[in-house]
Every structure is written in C-alpha cells, then in structure tokens.
Amino acid sequence: MYRQARWDEPLIFELSRPGRVGYTLPKPIEDVKVEIPEKLKRKTPLELPEVSEPEVVKHYTRLSEMNYGVDSGIYPLGSCTMKYNPKINEEIANHPKVAFIHPYQDERTVQGALKIMWELEQWLKEITGMDRFTLQPAAGANGEFTGVMIIKAYHLDRGDTQRTEILVPDSAHGTNPASASMAGFKVVEIPSNENGTVDLEALENAVSERTAGLMLTNPNTLGIFEDEIEEIAKIVHKVGGLLYYDGANLNGILGKVRPGDMGFDIVHLNLHKTFSTPHGGGGPGAGPVGVKEFLKDYLPVPLVSYDEENDRYYLDYNVPKSIGKVKELFGNFAVLVKALTYLKIMGKEGLREVSEVAVLNANYLARKLKGTRGYELPHKELRKHEVVFSAEPMKKETGVRTLDVAKRLLDFGLHAPTIYFPLIVHEALMIEPTESVSKEELDAYVEALKKISEEAYTNPEIVKSAPHNTAVRRVDDVLAAKKPVITWKMYKELKEKGEIDY
C-alpha cells in the first residue's frame, strides 16, 4: 500500500533568518549610477526569504515528496492529456541560445528563433489542415477567446451585426461558453443524443441568421468521435456560421484525420496537452490558433513570415484586419521550442502511433472496468482517447460518491481522474490514460477501481473517509473559497489578526 511522505514543512519565508545567504551577486565591473525616479522606488524593503542554498534544496525536496506529477505515475485527468514530458525538450529549451535571447533584439540577431516559430507553424498547419497560425495565445482558454474574437471580427467586417449567438454542445468544455460570453456572444446550448454526440435535429432548430458559429470538440468530452461531423459542418455553414475546433482532444485523432478536412474553419491547440509540453506550474502553456485562408487577415499581430528571396524570417505586422495582440510579445517561446522538439523527434509516423496507442489504452481500460459493480458506461462503448464512467449506481446503493472514489484512489498511489465532468454524466469519472502509460499501469488502475468498488459495498466508511495515506487529507473547500490565502503577505496579515490559526 502506498504511503506518501508527510513533512511538517513551514513556508520558506518562515525559514528565513537575517544574514543567511544562498546566492551572492557578482560585483559590478565599475560603479554604475542610475537615477531611478522617486515614484518608482520602493518604500519598504523587498521581503525575500534569507536562506542558505542547502536549506532551499532540503525545503523543496521535502515539498516534492508530498507531491504527485506525471513523473510519479499514471495521471489520467480526462480532457487534459497528461502525457510524459520528454526531458530532451527541457534540455533544448534551456540551451543558452534559447534561454538568453531577448524579445526586443533586432530580427537579424534572432533568425534561429524566428525559424523555430515558422517551422512549428508549418507542422501545425500540416497536422490540422489549417492555412495560417498565430502562436501568441498563452493557454487553451486564451486560444479559445482569440478564436471567438476572430469569428466576431469576421462577421462584423461583413456587416453581419445580427450574428450574436455561439452554439455550444452540452458536453463542451466549460471554457467554451465562458470564452464566447467574454467575447460578447449569447451562448446557445445544443443537447446530445442517446449516442453522446450532437443531436442534429436540435442543431437544425438552433441555427439561424443570428448564428455566429459552433464550438465543438472532436472527439468530444465523452471520448466519442462525432461521426456526423460533415453534416454538422453543412448545417452551420448553410446559415453563414463558422465552425470552431477546440483542440483539447486532438490526441485521439493525431495523424489520422484533420480538423480542416472535417469542415472546421478555426482551430485552437494545446501544446501542453497534445505536444508534450508541461502543464501548470511546470509550464506555462501555449494555445496556438489556426485558421483557413479566408480568415488569416484577422489573426493577432505579429505573425512570423519568411522572405524566400532574401532567405530571411521576420515579424509580419501586415495583417490588415487583425484583432490586435492577445498576449504581450510573441507567445511563450520556450514552450514553442519544446513542442517543435517533440514533433521533430516523433515524426509523422510517430504522431500517428501516439493516437493509436492512446485510443488503445482508453478502450483497454474501459473494457476491463466495464461490468464492475457500481460503475456504469453510458452511451457508445467504443471510445477514442478517453472514457467516462458513471458511479451513480454506487452512490445510490452505498452512499459512496465519485468524490470518495477519487480520494480513495490516492491511497493506492494513483492520481484521480477528472470527476463530475462532463456535466451530462452524473457522478462522472473521466479517465484519459494517454499513450505514455503501460499495460501494467492500466491493469493496476483498474484493479484499484475494482477494489474500491468492493470496499464501497462491504465497508463504505473506508472510502468515504479517504484518503488515509497522503500528506494532506480532505481540505476544507468551502473555507478555501470563502477565505483564500494565496500570498505570504495575506497569510502574515491574517495570522497577526488572529483570523487563521495554522
């Protein structure tokens, strides 16, 4: 049985002692006097912890022992594609010629960097069937917002001011309606049919002269391929709308079929999902947006272009109807480097194999778990890259909820899947193993879920009170939401006031 390390580790600020030094800055070659305007000068000293290098190493090593990441084991968060992040990516991205260039350098001195961005765009165009890409967006949701703003700009440019609605399936990512709303659109929800795919009759009834576009993930968040996608495209295009592809689940069709060939006009991708760059604190992310030829003039500026005659790459601001910038400078460059490294190493055949193994793994897990007491597999049996089970029967029969199952999985040293999503599946367990996971890891995951089922029906309290073997047990979610303590300054002030006692 798994046992996670548990350290009573203080914050690094609490380890601070005056005079302790972990790093000494080199002395300047000569005295440099800089006149800093008074309004820019700090009024109080900068509060940085004073700790030695050994203390820093021990502190973060202990914290890492209370953590779990993709290098620890299976991390099957559905619709997140938590695949292995190859270490060669980091090695290339940390090369001095990558790490120490500056975005304000003259173009002539960063031709290699611009070439990397240009080459990455060519790969993404080939993979998706799009004609032009911006690499600016910093994340998937940032990419979504960019794509929706392009839809808006396109319709306004044509004088179609009545197009105020974005259609979104009921199985969509939560960021889809959020992005559409932020762009000023009314969101119209399209229900799923009994197969878990878009209900064509409902879509036909929803489209109108007010339709700006439809946002769709394919495969969808149930892991099911929208096999009527060509008909969906016809319905949307017939009324003058655009079809937007949320690339969150591209890993399930990589190298097999292209969004552009399905009828999509706009695509956003997640380099931190499909193309192996790290998520979250290991990131940042990147959410490139690709468009068909007729939309390229609306992309954010600048684009990266190539002057063949002079063999020169350059930042291209000649984008007549651009929506402007969606991020400062030119995107998260180090992430772009990591993604291109992955693409070059994998090659076309390797990328095709990625989707084949990802789909095989998801279906193997689904088949092995299907029929286990308390878990139900709604909709179609055959899935792509992920599978969504419902633990509603278990909840009704034992009182054990999906949340309890997820917490109990941690006791086995396994990361929980995405839970309670998509919303159309009650007590959802959304499992995406990715291609990085071995058969042995899949078997262990299924056995843990089966063991939890057995416990739920024989000793439900052990599941309801889980986890038992982790550094942190159940946190107070309500308190965290009502009284967030997210900085050292907030923590210190609240503690001085006696409002927190930890």
UniProtKB/Swiss-Prot annotation:
Cofactor annotation: pyridoxal 5'-phosphate
Keywords from the named record: Oxidoreductase, Pyridoxal phosphate
Reaction equations catalysed: N(6)-[(R)-lipoyl]-L-lysyl-[glycine-cleavage complex H protein] + glycine + H(+) = N(6)-[(R)-S(8)-aminomethyldihydrolipoyl]-L-lysyl-[glycine-cleavage complex H protein] + CO2
Signal peptide: none
Gene Ontology molecular function: glycine binding; glycine dehydrogenase (decarboxylating) activity; pyridoxal phosphate binding
InterPro entries membership: GcvPB, GDC-P_C, GDC-P_N, GDC_P, PyrdxlP-dep_Trfase, PyrdxlP-dep_Trfase_major, PyrdxlP-dep_Trfase_small
CDD domains xref list: GDC-P
Coiled coil segments of this chain: none
BP term (GO), one: glycine decarboxylation via glycine cleavage system
E.C. number: 1.4.4.2
Family: Belongs to the GcvP family. C-terminal subunit subfamily.
Summary of the function given for this chain in its UniProt record: The glycine cleavage system catalyzes the degradation of glycine. The P protein binds the alpha-amino group of glycine through its pyridoxal phosphate cofactor; CO(2) is released and the remaining methylamine moiety is then transferred to the lipoamide cofactor of the H protein.
Subunit structure: The glycine cleavage system is composed of four proteins: P, T, L and H. In this organism, the P 'protein' is a heterodimer of two subunits.
Stated name of the protein: Probable glycine dehydrogenase (decarboxylating) subunit 2
Organism: Pyrococcus horikoshii (strain ATCC 700860 / DSM 12428 / JCM 9974 / NBRC 100139 / OT-3)
